[in-house]
């Protein structure tokens, strides 16, 4: 997962914050639109996955994500991204590793309908990261 560091202010009063930027698991995902033969696809639960067998050698997939959430694994010769720890969720885990490991509880996972998410977005002052991309992401910051 990419983590963006933001610095505000000037010495001696500097504020540093960090913004996690995982795969946004978009409804209108450019990576799905631009991939061929369902190399990148969305599961019924909304998790966007790259098929490792179909993606082998397909470096162009890296550039399809406007958020920069897909990277090239040189060793495996394939694009990779956050899988939302789908393999663990399928084994009964309640949350992905990043949420479990976050020492400040800054990361949360919520399974909610769109109307519920809008309410949560307002009450917690959440925002869509880079709304100009118009990808309908399911990750809010």
Feature names for model-found ranges:
Residues 1-141:
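Non-ligating segments of multi-cofactor redox enzymes
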């Amino acid at each position: 997962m990419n983590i963006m560091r933001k610095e505000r202010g000037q010495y001696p009063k500097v504020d540093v914050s960090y913004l996690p930027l995982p795969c946004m698991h978009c409804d209108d995902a450019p990576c799905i639109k631009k991939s061929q033969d369902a190399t990148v696809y969305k599961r019924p639960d909304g998790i966007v996955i790259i098929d490792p067998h179909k993606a082998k050698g397909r470096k162009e997939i890296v550039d399809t994500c406007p958020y920069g959430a897909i990277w090239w694994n040189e060793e495996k010769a394939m694009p990779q991204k956050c899988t939302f720890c789908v393999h663990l969720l399928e084994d009964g885990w309640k949350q992905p590793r990043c949420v479990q490991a976050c020492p400040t509880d800054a990361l949360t996972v919520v399974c909610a309908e769109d109307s519920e998410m809008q309410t949560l977005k307002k009450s917690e002052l959440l925002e869509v990261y880079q709304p100009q991309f118009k990808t309908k992401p399911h990750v809010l910051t």
